[in-house]
From Swiss-Prot:
Key word Disulfide bond present: no
Cofactor(s) this protein requires: a divalent metal cation
Protein species of origin: Bacteroides fragilis (strain ATCC 25285 / DSM 2151 / CCUG 4856 / JCM 11019 / LMG 10263 / NCTC 9343 / Onslow / VPI 2553 / EN-2)
Subcellular location: Cytoplasm
List of residues binding a divalent metal cation: D13, D14, S44, N100
Family, similarity comment: Belongs to the SurE nucleotidase family.
A GO MF label: 3'-nucleotidase activity
Coiled coil feature spans: none
Name of the featured protein: 5'-nucleotidase SurE
EC number: 3.1.3.5
Length: 255
């Protein structure tokens, strides 16, 4: 029986035209057969959102040896569901999201369409990784990230990941990466999130903006600190959001 190369399903939330996904494809191609299903336009901040009020459609853009590329009208999570159920003839060996223009460290993970991709893969029992870089520029430089992307993806293909566990990988905005840190998710919140954007007869328009406030800025174990100090931050992330430590106390309330 012929051994098949690993099947790697790729998506992003910045859209099919983003540089980050092109670079990700380039980094991953030596590792297996690549199928890309990415949004046809930017879908940043969509989290795990699904399209439920209208049909979703896709279009084949490219079919080459070892690489097939589609675009989709839906969300990043739609992309994974659609590819898994309508396009692929076998279960992927790996789902990869990114490379996102902008980091997904700390509480950003809850808003991230990149991590929505990863969570969807994880829920389907597929080892999944999200890659992001601390640079929002359309022309961001991903060269320093490349070797780490390949190494991390290769290790996950070889070793797998525990059930309901995925990897959130963030790169600092530097060409002189100091190394890798295995991190916890930084605790924090966003402040001053809305900036007025007045229109001619209506001032009720706002841009989402803001500043991230790290609740533990000196905590060298968290991802926010690692990125600020030039390290790749890898955070093992679980999909099960049950607060097990609170269950017994909640039972004692006798609700």
């Amino acid at each position: 029986m012929e051994n098949k190369r690993p099947l790697i399903l790729v998506s992003n939330d910045d859209g099919i035209m983003a540089k980050g996904i092109s670079e990700l494809i380039k980094f991953l191609r030596p590792l297996g057969e690549i199928v890309v299903m990415a949004p046809d336009a930017p879908r940043s901040g969509s989290g795990c959102a699904l399209t439920v009020t209208q049909p979703v459609h896709y279009q084949l853009l490219k079919k080459d040896v070892g690489l097939t590329v589609y675009k989709c009208s839906g969300t990043p999570t739609d992309c994974i569901k659609l590819a898994r159920n309508q396009i692929l003839d076998r279960k992927p060996d790996l789902v990869v999201g990114g490379i996102n223009h902008g980091d997904n460290s700390a509480t950003n993970v809850h808003y991230s369409g990149t991590m929505g991709i990863v969570i969807e893969g994880c829920l389907n029992g597929i080892p999944s990784i999200g890659f992001s870089i601390c640079d929002h520029a359309p022309g961001a430089d991903f060269d320093a990230a490349g070797p780490y992307v390949r190494r991390i993806a290769a290790m996950v293909l070889e070793k797998g990941l525990p059930p309901l566990t995925c990897l959130n990988v963030n790169f600092p905005n530097t060409q002189e990466i100091k190394g890798v840190r295995i991190c916890e998710q930084a605790k924090g919140h966003w402040s001053g999130e809305w900036q007025a954007c007045p229109r001619r007869d209506d001032a009720n328009f706002y841009w989402l903006t803001g500043e991230f406030i790290d609740h533990e800025p000196e905590n060298e174990k968290n991802d926010h600190w690692a990125l600020a100090n030039g390290y790749v931050a890898i955070t093992p992330t679980v999909v099960d959001m049950t607060a097990y430590h609170f269950m017994d106390e909640l039972k004692s309330w006798e609700l």
